[in-house]
Every structure is written in structure tokens, then in C-alpha cells.
Amino acid sequence: MVSLSTIKSLIEKKGANLPENVKSELYEKLKKYNEKYKLTKAEIEAIIDDVVKEYERALVEPGEPVGTVAAQSIGEPSTQMTLNTFHYAGVAEINVTLGLPRIIEIVDARKNPSTPMMTVYLDEEHRYDRAKAEEVARRIEGTTLENLARSTTLDLINFEFIVEIDPERLERSGLTMEKVVKKLESSFKSAEFEVDGYTLIVRPKKADKISDLRRFAEKIKKHRLKGLSGVGKTIVRKEGDEYVIYTEGSNFKQVLKVPGVDPTRTRTNNIHEIAEVLGIEAARNAIIDEIVSTMQEQGLEVDIRHIMLVADMMTLDGIVRPIGRHGVVGEKSSVLARAAFEITVQHLFEAAEKGEVDNLNGVIENVLIGQPVPVGTGMVKLTMKLPLRPQKEKEEV
């Protein structure tokens, strides 16, 4: 059996070019297998050599057009994707955008996803008990008067708005009629509230026209009585041996403060919220994760390095930028590359006005003018001195 110090020195000696994280992972694995199988020094050296060989094989060749390859590798499987919005895997009650629309949403860095949702994991105390998980879900779920109402009526003669509350919904939300009235009274000073059993009568003080009454009724119906803003319904599901909450809508910053929530595992599909709350590195990881899971949902396989390159380009400046004319492509230094993408005439006019010069360093601009592209063998500029041929002396005639 080889000592740990020998393993460490062999890794440092033979795998000098390996990244630090690969070295540490290799050390941990060798340590484990050395204890289990009593490896010899020659076997350990052979393993390290194989790892170095595989690492060098995985490296990008100098001059490889990584951007073009990444675009093709993500673009080609995307043509086989569905264009529909499907139900979230295993949660039929919550709609979530999948397939190509979701990929477009991510790379366009849309501020508001079409179907925002959060996956809320719970702490040790709440994750194994359904009742406790539902208690946390009630704290998160946004409840409005409209959610509790069985029916709503406008009494145009007495200028009143009458709401029939559903007792079951009221109990499920953890509210009482007294709490509902108290919340409404603190928010709407310009109205009187009267309770008769499960009937709530609202009389606005300053509504002179029917249109005022209608407007006021809409405002009261949409008023949030409890829960987080931006979050609609919540679903509690059992996954493995623990309960997980899925939400329709997202409020990532506030959900992490809710007692009972595990902030280390809770996630949202809104990339901008992640960037704001957890920072740009977390947003980069979220972009990679969202694209990979969307592809896998459709049964498509893409090398993660292509997706990592896209995520790196989108988060390079410390903010989440879209790929497109308002982001990565729009900020290219080459006029011809920008013009080739979108709004051609405008780009050319603006460049002419400023007197911009295109140095033809990229792929697109060189393709446009018919020059060899500066990738692969096109990167090499050959310079050689030709031997000067000695001039023959003029023969005298």
C-alpha cells in the first residue's frame, strides 16, 4: 500500500498541468481506492497517466471556433424540441414553459419568465411531516379576497359590494372573518366593512358613480390578505422521504426568510431574481442548469461545455445579458458582424456617422468579404524570407 504523501507527490509530479479541482478530486479517489484495493505505486502512476491523457484529450485545440461549434451544438437539438407549454414533471397542477420557448426565454434573459415557479425545500423540522410542510406552504401562498370568495355581487341600489366567503377555503388558508376585516380596514380607510356570518358587505365612502364602485370592487378583490406577493397557489408533494413545496409565481428574496424553509436548496426559475439575491455566479449556474434540464426533459443530449460557454458570455460583465442585439451580439466591436445579425441599415448608418473602422478580426466579417476566417489554420500567418537571387551581370554584347 502506497502512503498518502507519495500519492500527493506523484499527482504533483505527473499531473502538474491539471487544474486544482481535478487534482484534489483525483487525490480523494486514489486515497479511497488505495485503502480498498491496496494499490501499488505502478498502478497509481498508470491511473494518473490515464487521467492526464483524458484531460489533454478534452482540451480545446488552439484555433478551434468554440462559439460557432457551441451555437451549432445547441441550435441543432433545439430544432427537435416541442413548441408547447407542458405540465411540470410530476406536478400536473402547475403549468411551466418547457422546450424551445423556455430555451429562448433563458438566452433572451427575459426579466419576467412566462411561467415563474419556485421549488421550496424545507428544513429538518418540517420536511418529513406533511402537516408541517402544509403549514409552511400556507405562509408562502398568496391569498386574496377573490381566492376566498364563493361569489361576489355589486348592489347598485345601495352602492355596496357583497362578498360570500367560502368557509372551507377560509379555514384552509388559516384566516378568520375577523382577520380578513382587520386586514381590509387597515388598507382601505375610505370604506366601511360589515360582517354577517360568512357574508362581507363593503360600502365605499366616496363612490358617486357606478364606475367608481366597480373599480373599488376590483381593487378589493385583488387585495392580498396573506402570503408572499407574486406567489399564487402552492402544491406540497412527497419526493423520496421528504416533502417539497412547488409554487406558481416567484418571490425568491422573501421566500428565503420564511421560517421552515431551507435557503441552501430552495430555487426559482427566474434567473434575474437569482442574480439579484445570490449573485452572478449563482445566476451563471442557474442558466446552465435550466438549459441542461430543459434539454434532458426532451430527451436531448448536449455537451455541457457548449452551454457553459453561453452562460459565461451572458454573465461576463457581472449582469445577466441577453444573447442578441440588445446584449452580447449588439456589443460586438465589428460593425459588419453587428450589421449581419439584425437591423443592418441602422448599424451601417451609425458606423458611417461615427467613422468606425472594422479590423476584420472575427469570423462573420471575414466570411462577408470573402477572406479566410481567423480560426483553425486561418489563424496562422506565415512569414519567410526568400533567398535573393543574385543578379547576373549584364553580358557585354
Curated annotation (Swiss-Prot):
HAMAP family: RNApol_arch_Rpo1C (MF_00411)
Record lineage: Archaea, Methanobacteriati, Methanobacteriota, Thermococci, Thermococcales
Organism, as annotated: Pyrococcus furiosus (strain ATCC 43587 / DSM 3638 / JCM 8422 / Vc1)
GO CC annotation: cytoplasm; DNA-directed RNA polymerase complex
Family designation: Belongs to the RNA polymerase beta' chain family.
Keyword Transmembrane found: no
Secretion signal, residue range per the UniProt entry: none
EC assignment: 2.7.7.6
Coiled-coil stretches: none
Full protein name: DNA-directed RNA polymerase subunit Rpo1C
GO biological process: DNA-templated transcription
Family annotation (Pfam families): RNA_pol_Rpb1_5 (PF04998)
Gene Ontology MF terms in the entry: DNA binding; DNA-directed RNA polymerase activity
Subunit structure: Part of the RNA polymerase complex. An artificial construct of the RNAP clamp domain (including part of this protein) contacts transcription elongation factors Spt4 and Spt5.
EC top class, as a word: transferase
Gene name of the record: rpo1C
